[in-house]
Amino acid sequence: MSELTTLARPYAKAVFEVAQGAGDLARWSDQLGFMAAVVHDPTMKAFLDSPKLTREAAADTVIGVCEGRIDDQGKNFVRLLAENGRLTLLPEIAAIYEVMRAEAEGKVEALVVSAQPVSDAQKSAIAQSLAKRLGREVELVCEVDESLIGGAVIRAGDLVIDGSVRGRLERMAANLSR
């Protein structure tokens, strides 16, 4: 676990608990996603990293850019992060929050990396199979990586299924070298 994740987790957990208690998981998801995008922008990142910038000015700047996209609770959250020098953690906070939200809603995002594009029928079959195995609704994200040679690698949470030709070749090579 990276240091950023360790620092971001308590903030994500606190926001998640507030959002869940108020039944506002989707609203907070939107706000955190937007704030994270703002802070992740290279120009904004360089501005926020300036040693001459006060924490109050950093908060005011982020709030100003986010005006109309975040509510008063979102603004208070930005101020809290700024006071603690943690504004640049917003992308990690948003990512952790999304994992918590998906868990609470009984969903999981699965990444399918395949050597060739996955057809709609294959997507449906993969999603159904994973949903049965994981006991949750599965949202697929598909990517193509020709270096796999053939097959696919599926990642859903802690589960990794490597059915790629490259993976098989690497396992065979490892077994032969023993």
Swiss-Prot record:
Assigned GO CC terms: plasma membrane; proton-transporting ATP synthase complex
Keyword Mitochondrion: no
Subcellular location, record wording: Cell inner membrane
SS bond list: none
Subunit structure: F-type ATPases have 2 components, F(1) - the catalytic core - and F(0) - the membrane proton channel. F(1) has five subunits: alpha(3), beta(3), gamma(1), delta(1), epsilon(1). F(0) has three main subunits: a(1), b(2) and c(10-14). The alpha and beta chains form an alternating ring which encloses part of the gamma chain. F(1) is attached to F(0) by a central stalk formed by the gamma and epsilon chains, while a peripheral stalk is formed by the delta and b chains.
Family annotation (HAMAP family): ATP_synth_delta_bact
Protein name from the UniProt record: ATP synthase subunit delta
UniProt gene name: atpH
